[in-house]
């Protein structure tokens, strides 16, 4: 069971990297100017000079020749860059319809990826699965319609359900009294992560049902 949970954690990390690449590329292609990977790498190199503290401990950029070589660490560092000291701020997230929701989604994906990357046991893998479920909900709030279609969000929700099941995260991670009813996976994820927000998380299937109803009602 632990091996299965750790395999799921590896898949969560991989999926978060793929999501991160997609978000960065979409944002990059919405801005004015060149949309090439080389232009992005030049931008990062310039920002490393302007803000060495923020861009500290970055993956090595040498030899990067395709978007597929970028990981969550690099992608989210660019997307979440406050750019306070940038000579030419891009404000990639600020150019979206819902900048706050986009920023929350990027943070959620980064958090889930980091948890999955460092998972060494079933409990940590379960936490990564819970955080991935929350990240999918945040992606729905920030990116539904563009660049993520309803069908794609549905696929992410199904992946989230699969990860939760394989990691045993549909029961509370902390032990509970026998008579207590196990909370929903996403709800226990809020408790574990110390979040206070109410009413925005439910099971992955409930969220997807809501998404489908919203889409068909347009």
Residue ranges and their predicted role:
Residues 1-189:
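Amphipathic alpha-helical interface elements
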Residues 208-216:
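Conserved small/polar residues in nucleotide/adenosyl-binding loops
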Residues 184-203:
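Short Lys/Arg-rich cationic patches that frequently serve as NLS/NoLS or arginine-rich RNA/DNA-binding motifs
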